[in-house]
């Protein structure tokens, strides 16, 4: 147990200690204090032991929910839905959180304003989702969430403009409360991040100097230091000291799942920069879902000890033989063979890795988009004629049975397009379209899904649904700045052509550019096929009777005639 955890435990024992003479209100206040420091188990024990069934009902349900226990005795089901939405948001399942908030908006019209703020917070993390309701720019929380949405879709200028105007309003306010100061610094922190993403390090540095760390909570402090490190890491030891000077354990427990994943990766890179390989190995055991990432940075450090780079292939071969399901080693070995043009060798490594992953039931890794794409590319290199994306379709069949995720989005869309190219049966296309519809409900009408659905509808000779055209880029925008007449005259460039079209273009261009040369005759010009052959042609010239030998004169070579 770390020092911080020991301090929290001591604090929990102190503030949660029930003394003689404590009233129900005193005990209730101690329960609230325990919930504030996230000691839900201790708080729930006090509620069950010292308070009645009708006391602290919501606190009881909240603690039970945080501990993974469902409290069905609570009649207020909307309160539980609020908790489920918060949990989904913390786990970065923003689509699920948004659906729950939509139900709550219909069931609780009196709380519609607050619920819409939460809905905007969840929608801001979904880049393909269209915002149906207009956002009020008078509400600071709504403006902050809208700016976060612009950051998600990469519109840095809009985010900077919104955050700057919001910051100006907050600074002109007369309030001097701690919450107000915290809100100003939080807005500055987001503006600092927006400048970083836009590549304006000068303004980002100026904004960082205005942030008061004392007014930020522990999680925001860790994020602030992490952003400072990403702006400049001249001395990794100072960066390591500054980051570990914050309460990392508290920050990691409060971050969203997607933020926590990136934060753990940054910490591992910083540990490697200061030579703390042992701590990285410990983190690898704590986070098995990130084992591939940790193995990569550890292996990169291990290979530095090799005397010569020529020993690297043998080193990787030995590692792969000892651990055939080590994905990092297998990928490095395949990369080395591909760079040398040995595609069959790379494919054999891939097949061995596939066998190992199937034996260990690591199907989520086996059917990950990167590995599937690599396997398909290797098969295509070796068998280009009559190639079908069998690996891609296998992976898509696996992911379509799983919950909606990025891997399902990537592979199922590509599988549908591959089926269209392969002229698959109508039933197969319809099955693929049902998965696309599920993904549209999860991710929203993003361009990949809309284009796939439109392509499938055209293949099935069906009308495109009304309303989908607004998510497609108009043709006039696609051809802006392009001379269509010139392209029609010149033809399709080889670099832009795909598959059989490219091969036919190359064949036509090669035939037209070649000059026809006359074939040289196998006989000399003076050759007469009707002439009688010389019977002495096989005898040396000096021995022939029909050849006059040149006589040698007494005069010197080059003399006067």
Curated annotation (Swiss-Prot):
Molecular function via GO: 7S RNA binding
Matching SUPFAM superfamilies: TPR-like
A cellular component annotation (GO) from this entry: nucleus
Comp. bias regions, Basic residues: 514-523
Keywords for this protein: Cytoplasm, Endoplasmic reticulum, Membrane, Nucleus, Ribonucleoprotein, Signal recognition particle
Region feature (Disordered): 505-561
InterPro entries given in the database record: Signal_recog_part_SRP72_RNA-bd, SRP72, TPR-like_helical_dom_sf
Superkingdom of the organism of origin: Eukaryota
Compartmental location: Cytoplasm; Endoplasmic reticulum membrane; Nucleus, Nucleolus
Gene Ontology process terms (BP): SRP-dependent cotranslational protein targeting to membrane
Pfam families, per database record: SRP72 (PF08492)
Protein task: Component of the signal recognition particle (SRP) complex, a ribonucleoprotein complex that mediates the cotranslational targeting of secretory and membrane proteins to the endoplasmic reticulum (ER). The SRP complex interacts with the signal sequence in nascent secretory and membrane proteins and directs them to the membrane of the ER. The SRP complex targets the ribosome-nascent chain complex to the SRP receptor (SR), which is anchored in the ER, where SR compaction and GTPase rearrangement drive cotranslational protein translocation into the ER.
Family per similarity comment: Belongs to the SRP72 family.
Subunit details: Component of a fungal signal recognition particle (SRP) complex that consists of a 7SL RNA molecule (scR1) and at least six protein subunits: srp72, srp68, srp54, sec65, srp21 and srp14.
Protein name: Signal recognition particle subunit srp72
């Amino acid at each position: 147990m770390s020092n911080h955890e020991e301090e929290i435990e001591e604090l929990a024992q102190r503030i949660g200690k029930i003394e003689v003479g404590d009233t129900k209100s005193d005990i209730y206040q101690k329960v609230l204090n325990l919930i504030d420091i996230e000691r839900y188990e201790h708080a729930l024990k006090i509620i069950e032991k010292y308070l009645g069934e009708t006391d602290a009902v919501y606190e009881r349900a909240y603690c039970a929910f945080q501990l993974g226990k469902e409290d069905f005795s609570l009649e207020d089901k909307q309160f539980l839905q609020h908790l489920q939405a918060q949990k989904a948001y913390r786990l970065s399942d923003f689509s699920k959180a948004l659906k729950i908030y939509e139900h709550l908006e219909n069931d609780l019209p009196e709380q519609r304003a607050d619920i819409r703020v939460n809905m905007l917070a969840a929608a801001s993390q979904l880049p393909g989702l269209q915002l149906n309701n207009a956002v009020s720019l008078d509400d600071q929380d709504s403006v902050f969430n809208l700016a976060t949405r612009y950051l998600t879709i990469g519109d840095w200028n809009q985010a900077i403009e919104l955050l700057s105007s919001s910051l100006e309003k907050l600074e002109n306010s007369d309030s001097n409360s701690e919450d107000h100061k915290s809100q100003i610094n939080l807005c500055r922190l987001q503006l600092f991040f927006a400048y970083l993403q836009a590549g304006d390090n000068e303004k980002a540095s100026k904004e960082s100097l205005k942030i008061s760390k004392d007014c930020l909570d522990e999680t925001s402090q860790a994020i602030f230091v992490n952003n400072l490190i990403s702006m400049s890491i001249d001395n990794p030891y100072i960066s390591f000291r500054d980051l570990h000077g914050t309460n990392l354990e508290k920050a990691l427990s409060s971050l969203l799942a997607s933020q926590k994943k990136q934060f753990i990766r940054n910490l591992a890179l910083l540990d490697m920069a200061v030579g703390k390989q042992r701590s990285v190995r410990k983190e690898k055991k704590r986070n098995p879902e990130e084992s591939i990432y940790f193995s990569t940075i550890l292996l990169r450090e291990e290979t530095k000890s090799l005397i010569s780079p020529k020993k690297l292939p043998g080193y990787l071969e030995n590692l792969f033989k000892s651990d055939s399901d080590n994905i990092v080693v297998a990928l490095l070995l395949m990369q080395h063979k591909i760079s040398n043009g040995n595609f069959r060798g790379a494919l054999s490594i891939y097949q061995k890795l596939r066998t190992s992953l199937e034996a260990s039931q690591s199907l989520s890794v086996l059917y990950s988009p990167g590995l599937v794409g690599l396997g398909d590319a290797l098969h295509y290199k070796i068998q280009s004629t009559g190639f079908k994306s069998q690996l891609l379709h296998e992976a898509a069949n696996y992911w379509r049975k799983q919950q909606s995720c990025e891997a399902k989005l990537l592979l199922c869309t590509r599988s549908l397009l591959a089926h269209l190219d392969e002229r698959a049966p109508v039933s197969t296309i319809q099955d693929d379209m049902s998965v696309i519809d599920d993904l549209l409900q999860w991710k929203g009408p993003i361009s990949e899904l809309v284009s796939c659905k439109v392509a499938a509808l055209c293949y099935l000779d069906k009308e495109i649904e009304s309303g989908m055209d607004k998510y497609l880029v108009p043709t006039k925008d696609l051809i802006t700045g392009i001379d269509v007449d010139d392209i029609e005259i010149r033809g399709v460039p080889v670099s832009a052509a795909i598959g059989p079209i490219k091969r036919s273009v190359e064949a036509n261009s090669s035939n037209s550019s070649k000059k026809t040369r006359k074939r040289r005759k196998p006989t000399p010009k003076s050759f007469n096929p009707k002439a009688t052959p010389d019977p002495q042609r096989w005898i040396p010239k000096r021995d022939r009777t029909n050849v006059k030998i040149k006589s040698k004169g007494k005069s010197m070579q080059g003399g006067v005639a």
